[in-house]
Amino acid sequence: VTARVAGVQRVVLVAPPAPDGQIDPTTLAAAALCEADEIYAVGGAQAIFALARGTDTIRPVDVIAGPGNAWVQAAKREVFGEVGIDSLAGPSDLTVVLDSRSNLRWAALDLCAQAEHGEESPLVAVDTEPGVLEALESEVETVAAEQPTVRECRLALVDAPSAEAAIDLVNRTAPEHLELISESAAALAGSVRTAGCVFVGPESGTAFGDYVAGSNHVLPTDGTGRIFGPLSPA
């Protein structure tokens, strides 16, 4: 969609095949809706090199965009300069800023949902008042025990002395996803400078932005929000 809005004349989609060699039908349906010009059943680092340098069946492209695993990112780093890329992304991440009035159950659900990405995806919870993190940790353990899809994950608990200090930490770490669910969420949002996307208020869960409300899901990760922005037509 972003490529079409930007006026790209040739849109090429690559997607890893299933064991039967076929691309998932939902992916093909999405490609049809977006009017992709070419579709190839190939994924991983090999897809990146094929797009950048061409093969007997794939003509090279000028720009490669889209998320991927560590091997995909390594390949994008290797071909950067031969072709343009959207960003150098690491594992998906989430930071939540909360206080004593936050709904800790909802915060725990959002953190555990993000944990489904795997243990390499960093999760950070920042409180602006004493005593919140202990209660949140207990809630996360309860939710994780209820959800069979939750994997082992890394959750950092940060006790910030003030809301301003919490936002300073956010701007230095540049999270991909930032949830502001403290009482002062709306006021704090205007001070955020580097997050890939910002969810303001208790009912603005990350999953909504990833799958429903967001303009796209190609966001800077691993602190690269300081130098990269989300994928856009610009």
Question: What are these model-derived regions, one by one?
Answer:
Residues 1-29:
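Conserved small-residue-rich beta-alpha loop and adjacent elements
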Residues 10-14, 38-41, 124, 178-181, ...:
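Short hydrophobic alpha-helical runs that function as membrane-insertion/retention elements
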Residues 15-19, 44, 69, 100-102, ...:
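Short, ordered loop/turn segments at secondary-structure junctions
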Residues 18-23, 42-50, 163, 185:
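Short acidic loop-to-helix transition motifs that present clustered carboxylates
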Residues 28-30, 56, 80-82, 110-115, ...:
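Short, solvent-exposed amphipathic alpha-helical segments in soluble enzyme
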Residues 33-124:
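Conserved NAD(P)+-binding/catalytic subdomain of aldehyde/semialdehyde dehydrogenases
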Residues 113, 117, 125-195:
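A glycine- and small/hydrophobic-rich beta-loop-beta segment
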Residues 172-234:
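C-terminal core of ALDH-fold dehydrogenases
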